[in-house]
A protein has these predicted regions:
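Conserved HGGG/HGGXW glycine-rich cap/lid loop of the alpha/beta-hydrolase fold
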Residues: 27-82
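Conserved alpha/beta-hydrolase "acid-adjacent" motif
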Residues: 238-244
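Catalytic active-site module of serine/aspartate enzymes centered on a nucleophile-bearing elbow/loop
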Residues: 254-287
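Flexible "cap/lid" loop of the alpha/beta hydrolase fold
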Residues: 130-131, 136-165
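Gly/Ala-rich beta-loop-alpha elbow adjacent to hydrolase catalytic centers
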Residues: 117-125
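Conserved alpha/beta-hydrolase catalytic His-Asp/Glu region
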Residues: 150-151, 168-222
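Short beta-strand/loop motif that positions the catalytic acidic residue
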Residues: 225, 231-233
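Active-site loop/oxyanion-hole signature of alpha/beta-hydrolase fold enzymes
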Residues: 71-116
């Protein structure tokens, strides 16, 4: 993909693969604007489950010309490269370890960082933050998922289905998102976006990841998240429970919650402006 839609012409863009400790290669896209300096903070952006970077172009377009931004693609994405004949771990602890290792490889220790993420990416970030690891200045997290539970019928449906038949059940997954989890009347663009992400997903990884994170919970880890967190919810979002996010914020020592009007707005330029506004400032430095 050409990343011109995600940034300005004078921003340097470098696509790279980071080989993590279990041999998996994860794609990163590093946006570096001319204004970046060693003292200027940067953004580490981790998107949601099977999310495509094209779905975040409006957000990135606002952030990348102002701050170096490292966009990280998690291991369930089709871009990840796996060692031959290897059993790949898709669990949450492994995914948060990926963040730690990418940070170690791509960002010097002196560089101040802020995390941004969405949905499952936000969950991975919170799992990472709960450990004794390098901490960011702040994390801005859209609709984190606190516990990964599925409708009782979904594992029963998916477990016996080989990945080769993913095409056959994909319409059912789209129907579930469109009619149960999303507002197809108010946000048809989001329905289209999630449908496109399902179309682009790699079936074997999708299934393996879904079962590896099944029944995962953040509840016991949230009190250990000590660095500042801003949770972003959407008033019309039925995919991520607002009551749950409020409870999550209450359990963290330094967390706040802010609302946007819709899921679409959390993927808009307004979200990019919010990230810029929350970046830590330096004396005499423009945002």
């Amino acid at each position: 993909m050409i990343y011109t839609e995600c940034t300005d012409p004078d921003v340097r863009v470098e696509e790279d693969y980071v080989v993590v400790s279990d041999g998996v290669s994860l794609r990163t896209i590093d946006f570096t604007p001319p204004c970046d300096t060693p003292e200027r903070p940067m953004v580490i952006f981790v998107a949601g489950w099977i999310s495509l970077i094209s779905g975040w172009k409006d957000v990135l377009k606002k952030v990348t010309p102002r701050y170096r931004t490292l966009y990280v693609e998690t291991r369930e994405k089709v871009s990840a490269r796996f060692p031959e004949r290897a059993h790949v771990d898709f669990s949450m602890p492994r995914m948060s370890l990926d963040i730690s290792e990418i940070l170690e490889r791509k960002v010097v220790p002196e560089k101040r960082v802020c995390f941004a993420g969405s949905s499952l990416g936000s969950t991975v970030i919170l799992d990472y933050l709960s450990m004794e690891v390098r901490q960011p200045e702040e994390s801005i997290l859209i609709a984190p998922i606190c516990e990964l539970t599925y409708p009782f019928w979904l594992p029963l449906l998916l477990r016996p289905v080989p990945p080769s038949l993913y095409t056959a059940i994909k319409p059912l997954l789209k129907w579930y998102l469109r009619n149960i989890r999303l507002d197809k009347h108010k946000e048809p663009e989001q329905v289209k976006k999630y449908g496109g992400a399902l179309d682009a997903a790699e079936p074997r990884r999708l299934k393996a990841n879904a079962f590896a994170i099944k029944d995962y919970s953040l509840w016991g880890k949230l009190p250990d998240v000590r660095s500042p967190v801003l949770i972003i919810g959407a008033e019309s979002d039925t995919l991520h429970g607002l009551d749950v996010m409020n409870r999550m914020a209450a359990l963290m020592p330094d967390a706040d919650m802010e609302m946007m009007s819709s899921n679409r707005e959390t993927h808009s330029e307004k979200m990019g402006d919010l990230i810029v506004e929350h970046m830590p400032g330096l004396k005499g430095m423009e945002r």
